[in-house]
Amino acid sequence: MKNRTVLRINLEEGTSTYLKIPEINEYIGGEPVSIYLLSRFRESHPNTPYMSFTSGPFNGVFPYASKGVFLESIERGYTTTIGGGKLPALMNLANIDSLEVIGIAKKPSYIIVNDKEVQIIDKDKHSSLNSFGISGKRSQVEFKGKNILVDSYFKYSTNSEISNINNLKGISFSPSTNKLIGDKEQYVELYQKILEKQKEVTVTAGSYPSCFGCPLGCAFSGNTENLNVSILPRALVSCGFAENIYNNINIVFACFQVLKYDYNHDFLEAFAFKMGSFLREFNKTLEK
């Protein structure tokens, strides 16, 4: 199976670590991975402030796989939010499955990720995030009240004011990208096949800023997504309006084959049941 990587940033200690967690493969990506990582972290850190951004394996690689997952740990539980922007695509292209932020910063702070270097810097010494990273090759995250704003447009709404909890004011993410694709001819052919399924995307094209990997620019692109979507598209973090495309196991299997993942039809067909069982068991532990 693929090597899977989590970038964990500890605000309290001012440290960062790249963690190899092969068990992520069992959860594919996106929302299931974000919840699995929380469950794993809570086993040894029951009270430490925790949040994460998690990508999917098709972000930045295939059309309409254009969203990311923000998870916020709250008292006796968690919330997940789906939104757009370049962040999930850049994460996946850099082979980072999840960006975990733990602890509380001593001062209002920014996180700066440049290539593989991670810095936690004093916000008051810098007027904005714009002085970090390369425009066009970075994603910026701003924490504003109960909204998280990615790339100055894409919203991830939350239940609480994150910056008041952990003193984090923003993130500049500008990694090196090195995602490996197998047969390039097969990839281009499959990409075009999915792109041509635009009529299956249940939203009207517009002239708004598009999510990364989507040509439609719909009126909902900047909104927090609150659609009730099946677990497989949530693991791939496709747009909810493209659920019909990424709920098709034959298409998903073909995409994984091109990207050299080892998932087979049996695994994909059983995935929803397995994740349902996992979520029920984890949620029971939160109720205790």
Predicted regions and their residues:
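Intrinsically disordered, low-complexity segments enriched in small residues
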Residues: M1-I82, K86-I112, V118-K288
